[in-house]
Amino acid sequence: MTKDDIYFYIQLKKEFEFVFKGKTYILNYDKDDSGKEFIVFGQLYEGKRFESYGDLMNHAKVENHFFRELLEDL
């Protein structure tokens, strides 16, 4: 998996799920009450909202690692 793959998934709003060290992580999407869309990423049922692909790549973590650093291993 590459950053381009994740970018493509986000553009299509395609959900993605993977297991890392026995924990399930998700990438999906949500809207707030005003209609603003968010990317949701994190452990299953504990996802955090990110405003954009850039925000996700700069801040999303899997345990003590940035998500972007683990992509090639997925």
Can you say where each PLM-predicted feature lies in the sequence?
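Short, surface-exposed, low-complexity cationic segments
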Residues: 29-49
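Mixed-charge, Lys/Arg-enriched low-complexity segments
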Residues: 49-74
